[in-house]
Regions:
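NTP-dependent nucleotidyl-transfer catalytic core
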Residues: 6, 16-19, 25-49, 53-474
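Non-catalytic accessory regions of SAM-dependent methyltransferases
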Residues: 8-12
Length: 474
């Protein structure tokens, strides 16, 4: 039995003892809190929730309940300002916990609260034809961690990498490839070769503005399903994902689906038509928007003045596709807080369309922005740190330390990989999720103090103690 459940049962029994015949009709477990300071106890019950049913002030209720509790093997209860604070019997709690761990070490801490439920997690969302940089680290690792946690709690998880693969820039890239590229160079150089083509396009366009029209024409071909344009476009995606897979493999991250904006291009008509049918679209400077003034938000743009969709339209299409396909109970978007307004608008539009489930099931998991050594990330300005380079350097540093301190260690390369990559992941996840992160090499690769390597070292020492102790029975 979970400790919180047991404490709730103790509260229930105390109420029945102190106030015979009174049925408060309260879910005690749902009301139990964890105090902000451990000095106030391990759990706290707010007695004011009982005041109406018992016709008594919270302080008096807390005193009477504390007097009715006699479970020293589990906890002690103290009345404090209308709260009933519980202090666990640490010795028995530790013994009980260790017994549970030893009985099922791989499953300890798991649960079945998500049994029969599905959660879709949208995270990482790399851009096609661009290298994977540290700006993608937080969304990738937070999303992956949430995916594993939900799975451990019994949920069926669906992980989605919502690729940035739509826009006129892809027409420009195809135009550049047709003029100056060749397949061998792109296959060999990967994303770097595609980036070089894109840069050259803009350099040439400054001298020949007509190239911009050619780029737009190629993107129109993608939109219209032109076979040649689609073949090159899809090949660019394959090359990008091949490059990205090497980084994901290093991080231990996998996805169930790679479906980007292009996947939903032909699914936006349903959204637009339904908005029209329900009278939610209004015209604004030639564009079609959903008015959100009642929610103190600017209008949500659905169609531009030329009739084309934008990412909000495609996000709406993605929501309905995922609902119809996966029948989710929750859909999480692990995206930086800069997109907070966008998601509030999109989620509210779904509600206004008559789908009340959007309020509780659509969740934006926001996180802080990443800067690099005091400056904002900028690919154009060259101020960016690519993730594969970061991981390689972390592993190199770990290996150098191993060579210095434990030159005879077996599997040095594998240990260095685990320690180096672990240092990078931990340095990202240890931060408060919503706060901005300023990445510095020295901090990320510091192997002392509150770091990934220190946690791994502690685990290793614990394993060593267990081996020396020999067989231990529960």
């Amino acid at each position: 039995m979970e400790m919180k459940t047991l404490i709730a049962q103790i509260v229930d029994a105390a109420v029945r003892t102190a106030y015979p015949g009174v049925d408060a009709g309260i879910n005690y477990e749902a009301l139990l809190e964890v105090p902000p300071d451990s000095k106030l106890g391990d759990f706290a019950f707010p007695c004011f929730k009982l005041s109406k049913a018992l016709r008594m002030g919270p302080p008096m209720i807390a005193q009477k309940l504390a007097a009715a509790i006699d479970r020293p093997e589990v906890c002690t209860a103290q009345p404090v300002n209308g709260y009933l604070n519980f202090f666990l019997n640490r010795g028995n709690f530790a013994k009980d916990t260790l017994q549970k761990v030893m009985a099922a070490p791989e499953r300890w801490g798991s649960g079945n609260e998500g049994e029969g439920k599905t959660v879709v997690l949208d995270y990482s969302s790399i851009n096609i034809a661009k290298r994977f940089h540290i700006g993608h680290l937080s969304t990738t690792m937070i999303g992956n961690s949430l995916c594993r946690i939900y799975g451990f709690l019994g949920w069926h998880t669906v992980s989605v990498n919502h690729l940035g693969d739509w826009g006129t820039q892809f027409g420009k890239m195809i135009c550049a490839y047709k003029k100056w590229g060749n397949k061998e160079e792109v296959e060999k150089g990967g994303v770097d070769a595609m980036t070089a083509l894109y840069v050259r396009f803009h350099e040439e366009a400054e001298k020949n503005p007509e190239l911009e029209n050619e780029g737009r024409a190629w993107f129109k071909k993608i939109e219209d399903g032109d076979p040649e344009a689609l073949e090159i476009f899809n090949w660019f995606k394959d090359v990008t994902l091949k490059d990205a897979s090497r980084v994901y493999d290093k991080l231990g991250v996998q996805f169930d689906y790679y479906t980007g904006e292009s996947f939903y291009h032909d699914k936006t008509d349903r959204v637009v038509n339904e908005l029209k049918e329900k009278g939610l679209l209004t015209e604004s400077d030639g564009a079609q928007v959903v008015d959100l003034s009642d929610d103190n938000m600017p209008p949500c743009l659905i169609l531009k003045s030329d009739g084309t969709t934008i990412y909000a339209t495609r996000d709406l299409a993605a929501i309905f596709y995922r609902k119809d396909t996966f029948h989710f109970d929750k859909c999480l978007y692990v995206v930086a807080y800069q997109q907070d307004l966008h998601f509030r608008q999109v989620f509210r539009v779904v509600e206004k369309m008559g789908y009340p489930w959007a309020k509780d099931q659509l969740v934006h998991v926001a996180f802080g922005m990443v800067s690099y050594e005091g400056q904002s990330l900028s690919t154009r300005k060259g101020h960016v740190l690519y993730l594969d380079e970061l991981l390689d350097r972390a592993v190199e540093k770990a290996l150098a330390i191993i060579e210095e301190k434990s030159p005879n260690l077996e599997n040095k390369e594998e240990v260095a990989r685990q320690v180096g990559v672990g240092a990078v992941i931990y340095s990202d996840l240890q931060n408060s999720r919503i706060k901005d992160i300023d990445f510095w090499w020295d901090r990320a690769l510091n192997f002392d103090g509150d770091t990934g390597p220190y946690v791994q070292y502690t685990y290793t020492r614990c394993c060593s103690v267990m081996r020396k102790a020999g067989e231990v029975t529960a």
